[in-house]
C-alpha cells in the first residue's frame, strides 16, 4: 500500500465468482480508500477471459446493445440499418413492436425466461429455444433450476469444440417428479478451436493481433464463421451476412490481411 499509485488486476475467477459483484465492489472500494483511482498506473482493472472475448463483445452479442456498444434506441437501429445497407422498416418487421428497444435476457437469467409465467417476464412468451455458443454455465448458481429449464425447452443447440457442461447437463436424468419436454431437440455442433482457424483477436487493451492457423479442423469440426454462415444460408440471408467481409481485406503494417473465406 506504500508504493503508490498501485493497481489491482483480476480476471474471470473474481468476476464470475458466485459473489463476484461483491468482490469487484470490494476491489474498487479498496482502491478508493488507498487513493489509487483516477491516477496513471492505478485503478481497478479487469482482464477479459477466453481467447478473443473482447472482440466477441465488441461485435454485439450482449442483450442490451447493438455492435460497438450503440445501445438499442431507435437512432441506434437506424444507424445500423445504414451500415448494413438494409431498410429500417424491414428490420422493424423482424421484431415484435414492444421488444425491439428492450434489453434482452442476460446469460445468468435465461432460466427465469423459460420457467417463469409470462406476466413475470418482460416478453410475450417464454423462451422456447436456446443456443450456447462457446459458453457453459459452470460458474452460475441455480443448477437445479437450470436443469429444469433445459428439460422444458423445445430446442437446445450447443456449439463448442467439446461436449461442454451444458451438453452434459442436458443429457442428465431429470430430477424426481420432473419430465423432459417430449418434443425437445438437442444438437451438439462441433466448432473448431482457436488453433484450427485464422483471424484477428482483440485483447483487453483493445489491441488487435493476427492469429495464424496451426492445424486444419479435426474430424467434423468447422470454424465458428462457417457454422454461422450455414445458419444464415438456411434462414435466407446468407448473402447479407457476408456482403461486407471485403471491408476487412486491407494492408496494415506492411502486411496484406486476408479476406475471410466462407465455404
Question: Which stretches of residues belong to each language-model region?
Answer:
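Non-catalytic alpha/beta scaffold blocks inside enzyme catalytic domains
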Residues: 1-29, 33-39, 46-262
Amino acid at each position: 500500500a506504500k508504493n503508490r499509485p498501485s493497481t489491482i488486476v483480476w480476471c474471470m475467477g473474481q468476476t464470475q465468482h458466485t459473489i463476484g459483484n461483491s468482490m469487484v465492489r470490494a476491489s474498487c472500494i479498496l482502491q478508493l480508500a488507498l487513493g489509487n483511482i483516477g491516477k496513471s498506473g492505478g485503478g481497478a482493472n479487469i482482464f477479459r477471459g477466453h481467447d478473443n472475448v473482447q472482440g466477441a463483445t465488441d461485435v454485439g452479442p450482449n442483450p442490451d446493445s447493438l455492435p460497438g456498444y450503440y445501445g438499442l434506441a431507435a437512432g441506434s437501429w437506424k444507424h445500423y440499418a445504414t451500415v448494413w445497407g438494409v431498410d429500417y422498416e424491414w428490420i422493424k418487421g423482424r421484431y415484435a413492436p414492444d421488444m425491439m428497444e428492450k434489453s434482452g435476457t442476460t446469460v445468468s437469467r435465461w432460466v427465469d425466461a423459460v420457467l417463469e409465467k409470462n406476466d413475470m417476464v418482460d416478453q410475450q412468451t417464454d423462451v422456447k429455444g436456446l443456443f450456447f455458443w462457446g459458453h457453459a454455465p459452470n460458474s452460475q448458481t441455480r443448477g437445479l433450476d437450470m436443469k429444469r429449464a433445459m428439460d422444458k425447452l423445445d430446442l437446445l443447440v450447443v456449439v463448442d469444440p467439446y461436449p461442454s457442461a451444458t451438453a452434459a447437463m442436458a443429457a442428465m436424468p431429470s430430477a424426481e417428479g420432473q419430465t423432459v419436454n417430449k418434443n425437445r431437440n438437442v444438437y451438439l455442433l462441433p466448432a473448431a478451436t482457436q488453433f484450427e482457424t485464422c483471424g484477428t483477436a482483440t485483447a483487453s487493451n483493445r489491441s488487435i493481433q493476427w492469429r495464424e492457423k496451426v492445424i486444419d479442423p479435426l474430424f467434423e469440426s468447422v470454424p465458428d464463421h462457417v457454422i454461422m454462415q450455414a445458419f444464415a444460408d438456411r434462414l435466407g440471408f446468407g448473402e447479407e451476412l457476408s456482403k461486407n467481409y471485403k471491408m476487412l481485406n486491407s494492408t496494415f503494417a506492411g502486411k496484406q490481411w486476408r479476406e475471410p473465406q466462407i465455404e
